[in-house]
């Protein structure tokens, strides 16, 4: 009887552990973009916290924490702060993260023609990933391919 009771308790404890583990939130990298120009990044999750920097529409960010309606975010230079979440949305944008400039090409290879040269910090709409290349479109409408390690994320 004692052995059966111990087995039941052990089974309940194990089942509870499995439920507890599977119900824990799993955080994978979540990327968002700023919805309009002039969005403030603050030092804490409240409008009473000082503004750390101001961002423009489309700027991509990585969500690293959440507190109420606020997201703690980091950017491609690893600067971090808090943004009011309604000012962010899921959007496939990337930012040029090259040391100086990146060539946008007509196809996914260095053998293709350069269609534009982009400065560090230029935001682009991500259209497709193909191996180590990404197809992107600039707000001006210029479209092409960039070597993926030269953009973030």
Task: Walk through the language-model features, giving the residues of each.
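SH3-family beta-barrel domains
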Residues: 24-43, 53-57, 64-79, 83-106, ...
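Bacterial N-terminal signal peptides that target proteins for export
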Residues: 2-13
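Short, small/polar residue-rich loop motifs at catalytic or cofactor-binding pockets
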Residues: 47-48, 110-111
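Bacterial N-terminal signal peptides
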Residues: 11-23
């Amino acid at each position: 009887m004692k052995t059966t009771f111990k087995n039941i308790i052990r089974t309940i404890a194990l089942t509870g552990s499995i439920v507890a583990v599977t119900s824990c939130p799993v955080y994978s990298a979540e990327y968002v973009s700023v919805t309009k120009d002039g969005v403030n990044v603050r030092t804490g999750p409240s409008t009473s916290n000082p503004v750390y920097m101001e961002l423009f529409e489309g700027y991509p960010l990585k969500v690293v924490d959440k507190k109420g309606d606020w997201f703690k975010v980091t950017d491609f230079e690893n600067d971090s702060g808090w943004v009011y979440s309604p000012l962010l949305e899921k959007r496939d944008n990337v930012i040029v993260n090259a040391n100086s400039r990146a060539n946008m090409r007509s196809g996914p290879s260095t053998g293709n023609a350069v269609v534009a040269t982009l400065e560090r910090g230029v935001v682009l709409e991500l259209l497709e990933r193909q191996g180590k290349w990404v197809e992107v479109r600039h707000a001006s409408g210029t479209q092409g391919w960039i070597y993926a390690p030269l953009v973030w994320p």
